[in-house]
């Protein structure tokens, strides 16, 4: 691997890293040489995924419920027992909720906003001391927040809270990028379009729905796992050291 993209000696945390986009990113960071912690509410699933990913490098699974501030604080306590500094934080954990507009529940709205925005803020807040220990002018610490093209476009698919939550996350990320750049912490957003995941399985398992969905994408296909991994590696390595505050769609041209 070219030195511009090497993550040798770096330590990363990927929330929601046991499946989907989180797993894609975790594998990519491992392949680039990083030591990677993955966390999620299902500790057994995280440990199982970590065992599978350990063929690519050192991967550790942790149980962490990030739906509230208490969980973020507990995760920070656990990491402080294990590491001296955190070089890379990928906030991938999130959720969605779909229902017709007339019956869309307030509890669904609040859950999506809590997990997709507030929990990310709490996680960054609690892990900031470890990130500060890492960042320097030559090699800043990196925070990647996983947004969505739903936060850029206006297609809601009856997931009325999801797009607004991701738009809020995009703006929060820009605010934090400005706030933390002087402390050598870069904050960027990856805004995925369609990639294989549990959240998109209802489309990929339906041949007609898949054909209709792909027709909306200029490249006429969904994203591949290695394409997500490669973008994350770029942002976390020397290749992305001069980037902060960016909202990067990876969507096959969907938002053009």
Q: For the regions a protein language model found, what residue spans apply to each?
A:
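Substrate-binding pocket helix/loop in short-chain dehydrogenase/reductase
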Residues: 100-101, 105-110, 213
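Alpha-helical segment proximal to the catalytic Tyr-Lys
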Residues: 129, 178-179, 241
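Residue(s) in the substrate-gating loop at a strand-loop-helix junction
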Residues: 148
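Short, small/polar-rich loop/turn modules that mediate ligand/substrate recognition or access, typified
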Residues: 181, 186, 243-245
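Short-chain dehydrogenase/reductase
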Residues: 241-255
């Amino acid at each position: 691997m070219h030195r511009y993209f090497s993550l040798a000696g770096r330590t990363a945390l990927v929330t929601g890293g046991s499946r989907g986009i989180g797993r894609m990113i975790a594998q990519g960071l491992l392949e680039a040489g990083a030591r990677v912690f993955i966390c999620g509410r299902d500790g057994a699933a995280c440990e199982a995924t970590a065992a599978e990913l350990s063929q690519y490098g050192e991967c550790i699974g942790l149980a962490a419920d990030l739906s509230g501030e208490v969980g973020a604080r507990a995760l920070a306590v656990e990491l402080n027992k294990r590491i001296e500094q955190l070089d890379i934080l990928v906030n991938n954990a999130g959720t969605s909720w779909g229902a017709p507009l007339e019956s869309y529940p307030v509890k669904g709205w609040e859950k999506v906003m809590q997990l997709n925005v507030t929990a990310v803020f709490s996680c960054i807040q609690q892990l900031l001391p470890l990130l500060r220990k890492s960042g320097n002018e030559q090699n800043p610490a990196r925070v990647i927040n996983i947004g969505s093209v739903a936060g850029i476009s206006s297609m809601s698919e009856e997931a009325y809270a999801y797009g607004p939550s991701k738009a809020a996350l995009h703006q929060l990320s820009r605010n934090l990028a400005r706030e933390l750049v002087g402390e050598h912490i870069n904050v960027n957003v990856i805004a995925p379009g369609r990639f294989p995941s549990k959240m998109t399985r209802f489309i990929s398992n339906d041949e007609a729905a898949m054909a209709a969905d792909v027709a909306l994408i200029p490249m006429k296909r969904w994203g591949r796992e290695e394409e997500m991994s490669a973008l994350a590696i770029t942002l976390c390595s020397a290749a992305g050291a001069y980037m902060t505050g960016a909202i990067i769609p990876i969507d096959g041209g969907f938002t053009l």
